[in-house]
């Protein structure tokens, strides 16, 4: 009996080991067969027990006979799968197939290949790119007066617009042969981060021509004639671009786009040509009020078949329309939350343009949606994440300094535990954002077009940016609330919802896009199964489906085993690519990767097309994927920066908070999974020991707060590219100066309290009075008194807020300008 039990344990262990190692069906069958033969000859146990084992084993032998397997099993599953497969529109298919699969694909495997991520080169600026950031970018930041822009003008000054155009800020993605800067994605991102730390309005103005728009589309799809004519003009700022997709009825839903273009004959520049008569209504279009070249998405029809062929509905098409084309109405402005970057509606009635206005010419008619989704991912990885990161870096930079200089109860407010917790949270989230931005743009420079990470970055960086803005307001209080020239938080806080809403609203991105696109695009077998199901050649389709199906089954079993073993052992036997203080985070990501992949497969198998409608389940699985992706970016960023030990509290807080979120979202997914018996099985495999992963410990809060509230390499790395130059209008530079003065003054203040206040020699309640009395009592020297007065003056300059004559605040008032004029 004992021997039989030992053999059962050995057999079970071998099965688990083969599943964990992802042995092929043939290899697993062979190994188990050899063991069974040995057991049958030499093992103990009754004959019926051995017969049972062979009865369980022989079907696996038959599964290796592919024609038989296809006939008996795959054929039936194939028919069921085709019925379950949800209908997919052309726009959905093009969106799913857009871009490339990168690290996101590894996280779907249940056993990510860390070498793929860790071997990638750390992104670096070239000498030319660094010179641009230190030169023109620095100068642009110095020119910016955000209060003047947002309150007085509701626009950028002409000299700022001219500088942006002349220095090539709108030409960062345009190759040098067309007169552009041809910057890397990483450099492009760093430029935006720096500008965003100074002004969200100016950053929004800079990013649009470098994101999805005429220049990007021309580079990839334009004809040579279009490129040679338009790209140099765009690079020099002679043409100002905008792109119109969003409309009042359907938002950005291209499948329901009501804007139309009808192919017909018409007069263009004095000649009768075949062209397109456009009717459209767009809104929320950045740069539209001043744009000279309007990129336009519309549905193209050819009822008279003037383009040749039998097709009358060509689908979504993109064309470039000059501003002054008859029928175009443009110039009015929207006013997005006191962030007065140029944004407004574009309308067109019976606008006639030649067929050559189509990007890429007539041969690319109907390819507009493919163009947009293929190029959207790059812009979504750069523009909004960089703006959010720049704003967050500025908020952390100022909040750390402000919390050091603002005192309550004779101590800096940043020393209170509650404030420490908020500052630590802000800093860790900023570290996550910067890591994701840096590593992902590096991947783009390596040739990737990561469509799923684009959604992850867009959603999570803007959401973290919103949280950081709220936290900065909480810590700085009235300083952030009272608007005026001295307020460096208010306008950025007001503009936060803009980034939440644009380029795919965050609710939509979380509930539909991240997991919905990733489950098909990144899964190693789902897309292959879908393609097989839609293959008109039935024999080939069944053969491909059979191969994908059985790989998928083995994949699911392996991930179930990996998830169970990882959970039981607390990830301790999971292989990690690194030793040292970050090793455990790699192990936990591997464990959650297996759990996520297993849960994904069970959900898709049991719910089928219904999963598409269960948006909350999809959102939670997307959160798990996002948490693993962002934690991976944190670890890679830490490696890229040389593994500085002083940054470990930030890394620990970031990874722990992300992996805790992954655990909690998996838990929430299981609680709400509609097939309850399957949920119970999944819970037993994913959480056999319960919820064992903890959120960041409170002990990290003071360590991180100290890093942020003191000058040092960790603070400098975290807030790299923040515009901090010490000049009268840059309050981030001024608050940094005040912080340094406060730190230098602390020993002197302490001496006054100990030797003066406590002994009764100093009785004044305010610092200026205490300085006078302490100097008179000989507690401090004259030089120390001068030092303290300078420190107090600088601190009060920061702490003080603006007040106004009531007439200055009346809408449209010129009172302030009259005062300035004398």
Enumerate the language-model features and the residues they cover.
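Charged, glycine-rich active-site and insertion segments that engage polyanionic ligands
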Residues: 448-480, 649-662
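Amphipathic, small/basic residue-rich leader segments at the start of a protein or domain
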Residues: 7-16, 28-38, 48, 52-209, ...
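C-terminal amphipathic alpha-helical interaction region
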Residues: 551-822
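Flexible, small-/acidic-enriched active-site or ligand-binding loops
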Residues: 326-352
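Loop-to-helix element that buttresses phosphate recognition and phosphoryl-transfer chemistry
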Residues: 418-445, 470-473, 626-637
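Flexible glycine/proline-rich, aromatic-decorated loop/lid segments
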Residues: 343, 351-352, 358-371, 475-493
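A glycine-rich, basic-preceded beta-loop-alpha segment at the flavin cofactor/substrate interface
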Residues: 347-380, 397-414, 559-583, 592-612
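A short core secondary-structure module
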Residues: 271-329
């Amino acid at each position: 009996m004992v021997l039989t039990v030992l053999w059962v344990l050995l057999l079970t262990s071998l099965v688990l080991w083969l599943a964990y190692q992802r042995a092929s069906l043939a290899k697993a069958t062979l190994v188990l067969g050899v063991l069974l033969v040995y057991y049958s000859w030499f093992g103990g146990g009754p004959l019926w027990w051995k017969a049972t084992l062979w009865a369980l084993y022989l079907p696996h032998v038959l599964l290796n006979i592919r024609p038989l397997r296809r006939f008996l099993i795959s054929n039936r599953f194939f028919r069921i799968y085709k019925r379950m497969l949800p209908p997919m529109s052309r726009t959905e298919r093009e969106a799913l197939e857009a871009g490339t699969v990168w690290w996101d694909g590894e996280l779907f495997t249940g056993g990510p290949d860390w070498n793929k991520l860790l071997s990638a080169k750390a992104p670096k600026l070239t000498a030319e790119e660094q010179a641009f950031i230190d030169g023109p970018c620095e100068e642009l930041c110095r020119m910016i007066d955000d209060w003047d822009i947002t309150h007085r003008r509701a626009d950028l000054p002409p000299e700022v617009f001219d500088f942006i155009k002349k220095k090539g800020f709108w030409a960062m993605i345009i190759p040098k042969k067309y007169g552009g800067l041809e910057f890397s994605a990483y450099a492009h991102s760093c430029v935006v981060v720096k500008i965003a730390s100074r002004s969200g309005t100016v950053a929004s103005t800079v990013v649009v021509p470098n994101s999805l728009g005429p220049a990007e589309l021309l580079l990839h799809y334009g004809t040579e004639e279009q490129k040679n004519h338009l790209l140099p003009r765009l690079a020099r700022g002679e043409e100002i671009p905008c792109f119109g997709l969003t409309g009042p009825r359907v938002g950005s839903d291209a499948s329901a786009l009501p804007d139309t273009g009808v192919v017909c004959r018409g007069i263009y520049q004095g000649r009768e040509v075949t062209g397109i008569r456009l009717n459209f209504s767009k809104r929320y279009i950045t740069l539209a009020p001043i744009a000279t070249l309007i990129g336009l998405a519309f549905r193209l029809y050819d009822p008279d078949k003037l383009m040749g062929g039998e097709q009358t509905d060509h689908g979504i098409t993109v064309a470039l329309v000059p501003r002054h084309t008859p029928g175009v109405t443009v110039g009015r402005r929207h006013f997005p939350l006191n962030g007065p970057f140029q944004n407004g509606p574009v309308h067109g009635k019976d606008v006639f343009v030649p067929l050559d206005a189509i990007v890429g010419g007539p041969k690319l008619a109907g390819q507009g949606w493919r163009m947009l989704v293929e190029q959207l991912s790059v812009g979504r990885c750069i523009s909004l994440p960089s703006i959010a990161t720049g704003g967050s870096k500025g908020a952390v930079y100022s909040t750390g300094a402000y919390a050091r200089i603002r005192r309550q109860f004779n101590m800096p407010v940043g020393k209170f535990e509650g404030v420490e917790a908020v500052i630590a949270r802000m800093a860790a989230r900023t570290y996550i954002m910067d890591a994701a931005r840096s590593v992902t743009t590096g991947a783009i420079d390596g040739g990737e077009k990561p469509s799923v990470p684009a959604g992850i970055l867009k959603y999570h960086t803007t959401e973290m940016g919103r949280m950081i803005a709220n936290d900065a307001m909480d810590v700085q209080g009235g300083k952030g609330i009272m608007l005026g020239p001295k307020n460096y938080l208010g306008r950025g806080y007001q503009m936060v919802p803009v980034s939440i809403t644009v380029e795919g609203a965050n609710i939509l991105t979380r509930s539909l896009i991240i997991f919905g696109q990733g489950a098909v695009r990144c899964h190693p077998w789902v897309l292959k199964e879908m393609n097989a199901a839609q293959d008109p050649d039935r024999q080939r389709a069944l053969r491909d489906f059979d191969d994908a199906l059985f790989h998928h089954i083995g994949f699911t079993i392996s991930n179930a085993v990996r998830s169970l073993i990882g959970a039981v052992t607390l990830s301790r036997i999971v292989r990690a690519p690194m030793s040292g203080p970050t090793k455990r985070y790699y192990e936990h990501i591997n464990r959650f990767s297996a759990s996520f992949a297993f849960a994904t497969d069970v959900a898709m198998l049991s719910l089928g097309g219904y999963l598409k409608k269960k948006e909350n389940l999809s959102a939670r699985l997307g959160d798990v994927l996002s948490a693993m992706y962002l934690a991976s970016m944190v670890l890679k960023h830490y490696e890229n920066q040389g593994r500085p030990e002083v940054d470990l509290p930030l890394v620990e807080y970031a990874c722990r908070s992300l992996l805790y979120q992954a655990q909690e979202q998996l838990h929430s997914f299981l609680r709400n999974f509609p097939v309850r018996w399957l949920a119970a099985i999944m819970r037993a495999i994913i959480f056999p020991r319960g919820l064992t992963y903890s959120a960041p410990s409170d002990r990290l809060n003071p360590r991180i707060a100290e890093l942020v509230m003191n000058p040092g390499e960790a603070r400098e790395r975290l807030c790299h590219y923040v515009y901090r130059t010490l000049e009268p209008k840059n309050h981030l530079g001024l608050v940094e100066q005040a912080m340094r003065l406060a730190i230098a003054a602390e020993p002197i203040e302490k001496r006054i309290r100990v030797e003066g206040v406590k002994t009764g020699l100093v009785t004044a309640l305010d610092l200026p009075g205490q300085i006078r009395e302490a100097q008179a009592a000989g507690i401090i020297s004259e030089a120390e008194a001068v030092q303290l007065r300078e420190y107090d003056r600088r601190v009060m300059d920061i702490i003080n807020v603006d007040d106004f004559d009531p007439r200055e605040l009346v809408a449209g008032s010129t009172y302030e300008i009259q005062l300035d004029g004398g």
